[in-house]
Amino acid sequence: MARIIALDGAQGEGGGQILRSALSLSMITGQPFEMSDIRAGRAKPGLLRQHLTAVRAATEICGAQVNGDELGSQQLRFTPGPIRGGEYRFAIGSAGSCMLVLQTVLPALWFADGSSRVEVHGGTHNQAAPSADFICRVWEPLLARMGISQRTTLIKHGFYPAGGGAAATVVEPATSLRGLTLISRGETLRTTAEALLAAVPYHVGEREVATLEAHFPLAEKNVVALEGGCGPGNALLLMIQSEQLTELFAAFGVKGTSAEAVANQVAHEARRYLASPAAVGEHLADQLILPLALAGEGAFTVARASAHLLTNIAVVERFLPVRFSCEATESGYLVRVSD
């Protein structure tokens, strides 16, 4: 029987990414794990609906044996079986992030025995998670360059707190993974903005986009009034397309916060990214660790080595025979993986 990997859910930033990465890696490597103090660093520790859905999705996809899969649990033991391609559908039952559930199981399905389609219902545009737009426009184009065939479709927008959204991903098994090197982003080619409105006055989106345009020359700007009862909700997206990659920055409207304040939040993050020569933004850096580790090679530059990034690296190194280096440079950090 494979050795059980013991993980401390309180390590590093103590969030849900430790659990999600462990589930992905356990399925891929066949190594069981047990985790204590799940999400100990959060105001509400233990498994919330989104995390529980990720556990149960992973369990179904690989026929795992699992103990501790209940709301609020801070302990989990997960023993994986073989990864099975197929049609899967999961419902979070709240506005929890569909994208984080998908990002838990999709890496395993890159190694499945056949094609898969995974549909998840919940939130698609959440404050503390990658949006559906980030997955489709930023993450998946980079995965394609690594040899991964995966396409996510946004079925219906879902905002906090109502949820009610859905997204589906079709994924093919990967024959091999190529490394990816992102040292310089190159010249900025195009900057676009999009305001999404669900049961929110149209002028809110107009003001958000106008405020962004005062900061950046926009090649394209859109205000999209969503229909179908998916609100209330508001998201402002700024896409920066460079020669080597596209980055996306987002902020979400909340009651009591002006449209101008939402736009200024996005502008602040984007300006901070553009002020550094680093290729990759802080959040995208987190999303690249697992695929690069699975490829066994790759490198990128990032302005800041966050606790989230370093914690994710530590978890990956427990499961895979790879080593990451995170070297400080004059303009940030060079992150490199080798086997």
UniProtKB/Swiss-Prot annotation:
Secretion signal span: none
Entry annotation: catalytic residues: 308
Binding site for ATP: 103, 283-287
Cellular component annotations (GO), alphabetically ordered: cytoplasm
EC code(s) of this entry: 6.5.1.4
Gene Ontology molecular-function annotations: ATP binding; RNA-3'-phosphate cyclase activity
Biological processes annotated in GO: RNA processing
Highest taxon, organism lineage: Bacteria
Keywords in alphabetical order: ATP-binding, Cytoplasm, Ligase, Nucleotide-binding
Compartments where found: Cytoplasm
Alphabetized Pfam families for the sequence: RTC (PF01137), RTC_insert (PF05189)
UniProt main location, coarse: cytoplasm
SUPFAM superfamilies xref list: EPT/RTPC-like (SSF55205), RNA 3'-terminal phosphate cyclase, RPTC, insert domain (SSF52913)
Reactions accelerated catalytically: a 3'-end 3'-phospho-ribonucleotide-RNA + ATP = a 3'-end 2',3'-cyclophospho-ribonucleotide-RNA + AMP + diphosphate
NCBIfam families according to UniProt: PRK04204.1-2, PRK04204.1-3, RNA_3prim_cycl
Function (record text): Catalyzes the conversion of 3'-phosphate to a 2',3'-cyclic phosphodiester at the end of RNA. The mechanism of action of the enzyme occurs in 3 steps: (A) adenylation of the enzyme by ATP; (B) transfer of adenylate to an RNA-N3'P to produce RNA-N3'PP5'A; (C) and attack of the adjacent 2'-hydroxyl on the 3'-phosphorus in the diester linkage to produce the cyclic end product. The biological role of this enzyme is unknown but it is likely to function in some aspects of cellular RNA processing.
Matches recorded under HAMAP family: RTC (MF_00200)
Homology family: Belongs to the RNA 3'-terminal cyclase family. Type 1 subfamily.
Protein name: RNA 3'-terminal phosphate cyclase
Gene: rtcA
